[in-house]
């Protein structure tokens, strides 16, 4: 079991009568509570169509059947017909002790698009301050394209946990994805004033690190309110794209096509394109990311963007 505690969290007491043995998921509500779920998916090109050839799950983390909304011949297509998959987590959010692990692999020639049917919610920690964890590993083999496009994450006041995303790209594999995070519930007058969330990103190509980032979000730290850090903003988003044949030209295309605003910026380094949003409008962050993806999609796949139907419900 991964240690999800932060410095200063109370140590786990000895197990007593009625407690579940350590190391497994169980109905317990002390500092050792642990609810694990995992999902492992694999995609492969079979006769010009991307097939989901591996789907293993443990706990309440599954997928709907694959969708194929992009039928039809595309001249000079680099990949097989795309497969759209929706990741389902019926609880709808993470509470203390939850630990989700998602592993996605796209093999050579495959083109997979993954999203979620709704926003992910990060709930307030329990009275013990037990953390949650969500860990995503994306593996892209040479000649494959993976699109990781989850709906936004809503972080409630008092939430404590870690989100990590690891991208392992090989050869000329391509990947585009985003993370949109909204802190607190301003509309309900419930800002994010307590708790601690940490986000980690790591991207490698052929084992070589191209982008690593660790971002702790602690409303009690000066960084959270200082203009040199979060600046008190409640919404942030990061979009990445790796594998573009002309990343600087893609940057210029985004600057030309997206509405000008001081809340977003885009750049590229080491052939990794990064777009950032920092502000207070969740819808604006989502729209910027979606518009950027629609611009980049043809650059990556020779196909126009096909918006998942679930986004429109």
From Swiss-Prot:
Annotated family: Belongs to the UreD family.
Native species: Chromohalobacter salexigens (strain ATCC BAA-138 / DSM 3043 / CIP 106854 / NCIMB 13768 / 1H11)
Skewed-composition ranges (Gly residues): 15-26
One Pfam family, short name: UreD
Tagged with keyword Cytoplasm: yes
GO molecular function: nickel cation binding
Disulfide bridge positions per record: none
Function: Required for maturation of urease via the functional incorporation of the urease nickel metallocenter.
An annotated GO cellular component: cytoplasm
Protein name: Urease accessory protein UreD
Region (Disordered): 1-30
Subcellular location: Cytoplasm
Keyword Chaperone among record annotations: yes
Alphabetical list of InterPro entries matching this protein: UreD
HAMAP family in the record: UreD
UniProt entry keywords in alphabetical sequence: Chaperone, Cytoplasm, Nickel insertion
Subunit and interaction comment: UreD, UreF and UreG form a complex that acts as a GTP-hydrolysis-dependent molecular chaperone, activating the urease apoprotein by helping to assemble the nickel containing metallocenter of UreC. The UreE protein probably delivers the nickel.
């Amino acid at each position: 079991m991964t240690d999800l505690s932060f410095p200063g969290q109370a140590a786990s007491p000895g197990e007593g009568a009625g407690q579940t043995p350590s190391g497994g998921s169980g109905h317990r509500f002390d500092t050792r509570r642990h609810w694990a779920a995992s999902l492992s998916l694999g995609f492969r090109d079979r006769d010009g169509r991307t097939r989901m050839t591996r789907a293993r799950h443990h706990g309440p983390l599954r997928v709907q059947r694959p969708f194929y909304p992009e039928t039809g011949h595309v001249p000079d297509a680099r990949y097989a017909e795309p497969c759209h998959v929706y990741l389902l987590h019926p609880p709808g959010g993470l509470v203390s002790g939850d630990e989700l692990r998602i592993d996605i692999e796209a093999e050579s020639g495959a083109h997979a698009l993954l999203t979620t049917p709704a926003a992910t919610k990060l709930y307030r920690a329990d009275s013990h301050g037990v953390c949650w964890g969500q860990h995503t590993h994306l593996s892209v083999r040479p000649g494959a394209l993976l699109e990781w496009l989850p709906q936004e994450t809503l972080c409630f006041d008092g939430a404590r946990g870690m989100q990590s995303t690891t991208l392992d790209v090989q050869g000329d594999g391509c990947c585009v994805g985003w993370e949109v995070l909204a802190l607190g519930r301003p509309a309900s007058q419930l800002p994010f004033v307590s708790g601690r969330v940490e986000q980690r990103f790591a991207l490698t190509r052929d084992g070589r690190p191209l982008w690593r980032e660790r971002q702790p979000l602690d409303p009690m730290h000066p960084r959270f309110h200082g203009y040199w850090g979060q600046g008190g903003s409640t919404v942030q988003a990061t979009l990445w794209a790796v594998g573009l044949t002309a990343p600087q030209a893609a940057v210029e295309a985004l600057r030309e096509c997206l509405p000008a605003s001081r809340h977003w910026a885009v750049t590229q380094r080491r052939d990794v394109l990064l777009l950032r949003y920092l502000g207070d409008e969740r819808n604006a962050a989502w729209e910027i990311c979606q518009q950027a993806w629609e611009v980049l999609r043809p650059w990556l796949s020779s196909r126009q963007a096909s918006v998942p139907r679930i986004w429109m419900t």
